[in-house]
Structures are given as C-alpha cells and as structure tokens.
C-alpha cells in the first residue's frame, strides 16, 4: 500500500537566508560561462560550491571560436577555468580532470585525443596538461605560448602578460620535444636568445612583446623596410 504524501506547513520549510544570493551568483556565472549543457554544468557548479572548490566559471564572456562538431570546443576562457581548479596540485588525477572537463561541457573524445599527445596512466603533471591545452588552442608553438602567458600572468587583462622565464622555457621545451620538426638545438638556441634579451631588463620575466609578433606586424615591418630600400 503506497504511503500517503507527506504534507509540510510553512513553518516546517526552512529556506536559508543566503539562498537568494546563491541563486543570483549562479545566474551571473551561467551568463558569463555560457555552458553548452546547462544541466551538466550546473551539477558541476553546485558540486564544487558544496565542497568549497574553485567554481567552473569564466572570468568574462567569450565570443565563440569553435563548435564541438568541427573543433575541440576548448577556448582560452575554459582552459583558464581548468587552471583555476587544478593549479594548486602538481599532479592531477585523470579521473578528476576528466570530470572537470565534462562539467565544462567539452567533448570526451577531445580530452582523450589531447592525452594521446603525451600518454600517461593515472595522473598527469598539471603544467604539462595546461601546455597541451594551449597547443590545442594555437596552431604554432609561439601561439601556444601566447595563450600560456595570458592564462598564467598576474598582469591585468590587456597588459604585458608576463610570466617567469623558467616556466616559459619549461613549457617551450616540453611542447617542442613533442614536435618532430623542431630539433633540440633549435629549441635551446631560441631560448638562449630570448633569455639574453630579457636578462637585463625583465627581472627574470618574459612577456608577449618579447617573443610574440603577429603576422600583421611582421608584414608592416617588411613593407616599411622595402620602402626604405627604394
């Protein structure tokens, strides 16, 4: 025999006073993050909130640059969210990392494809995973390092995006080692030239202006030099 429905009076229903603010912050977070699957993302959001973990929330809205059907779905903003959630650990368990990836509504097959670049068993060094994610965002090694600087920097958005040269050189060597077209001698020569340029004026830090030169600027410089030659 089914049990009768339990009835509660208004005095028995306790609504925590902080609930309106929680829902307000949740709504703002959803608007900024624009998750592809709201239910999946919401589960990850409130799970992290209940544990006191960093939330899967972007710092700001992003213009979409890819679709999950044709590309990774990964964006600089989402990769930065993962970094906020994982950077306090030197190594991250793959099961935990995959769940965080899933909570950001990123395709599982792309997670596996990323790990195939540098296979591991149960865990991965976080800085290595971050480097692989940056390489997935950028077509070239320098573009990947640009994304790395923008994610790791303490400078305000739009600033020089400086990070320690030690971190930069580690990631550059790591990614270059995965690229069969880049020799170790080329890597070391390039890093040595960068270090020489920044040692006297950057206090061990490297920023975008030290290594990243957009194609547009290169073309303008080339045109200017040709004009001078004429």
UniProtKB/Swiss-Prot annotation:
Per UniProt, subunit arrangement is: Component of the axonemal radial spoke complex 1 (RS1), at least composed of spoke head proteins RSPH1, RSPH3, RSPH9 and the cilia-specific component RSPH4A or sperm-specific component RSPH6A, spoke stalk proteins RSPH14, DNAJB13, DYDC1, ROPN1L and NME5, and the anchor protein IQUB. May interact with AKAP3. Interacts with FSCB; the interaction increases upon spermatozoa capacitation conditions. Interacts with CFAP61.
The entry's cellular-component GO terms read: motile cilium; radial spoke
Instruction: Cite the RIIa domain residue spans from the record.
Output: 17-54
Q: Cellular location of this protein?
A: Cell projection, Cilium, Flagellum; Cell projection, Cilium
What is this protein for, i.e. what is its function?
A: Functions as part of axonemal radial spoke complexes that play an important part in the motility of sperm and cilia. Important for male fertility. With ROPN1, involved in fibrous sheath integrity and sperm motility, plays a role in PKA-dependent signaling processes required for spermatozoa capacitation.
Asked whether the UniProt record includes Ubl conjugation among its keywords, one would answer: yes
* Family membership noted in the UniProt record: Belongs to the ropporin family.
Query: Which protein is depicted?
Result: Ropporin-1-like protein
Gene it is expressed from: ROPN1L
> Where is this chain primarily localised?
other
**Some GO term, biological process aspect, for this entry: which one?**
flagellated sperm motility
UniProt signal peptide? none
Report the PTM annotation: Sumoylated, sumoylation decreases upon spermatozoa capacitation conditions.
Swiss-Prot/TrEMBL keywords: Cell projection, Cilium, Flagellum, Ubl conjugation
Q: Which domain of life is it from?
A: Eukaryota
């Amino acid at each position: 025999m089914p049990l009768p429905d339990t009835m509660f009076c208004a005095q028995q229903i306790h609504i925590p006073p902080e609930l309106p603010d929680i829902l307000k912050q949740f709504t703002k977070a959803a608007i900024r993050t624009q998750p592809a699957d709201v239910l999946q993302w919401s589960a990850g959001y409130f799970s992290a909130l209940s544990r006191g973990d960093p939330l899967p929330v972007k710092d700001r809205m992003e213009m979409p640059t890819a679709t999950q059907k044709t590309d990774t779905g990964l964006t600089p903003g989402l990769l930065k969210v993962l970094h906020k959630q994982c950077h306090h650990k030197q190594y991250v368990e793959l099961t935990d990392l995959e769940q965080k990836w899933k909570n950001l509504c990123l395709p599982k097959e792309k997670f596996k494809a990323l790990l195939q670049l540098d296979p591991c068993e149960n865990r991965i060094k976080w800085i290595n995973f971050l480097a692989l994610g940056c390489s997935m965002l950028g077509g070239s090694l320098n573009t990947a390092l640009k994304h790395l600087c923008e994610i790791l920097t303490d400078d305000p958005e739009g600033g020089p995006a400086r990070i320690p040269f030690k971190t930069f050189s580690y990631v550059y060597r790591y990614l270059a080692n995965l690229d069969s077209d880049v020799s170790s001698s080329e890597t070391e020569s390039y890093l040595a030239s960068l270090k020489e340029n920044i040692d006297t004026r950057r206090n061990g830090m490297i920023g975008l202006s030290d290594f990243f030169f957009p194609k547009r600027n290169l073309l303008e410089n080339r045109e200017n030099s040709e004009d001078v030659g004429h």
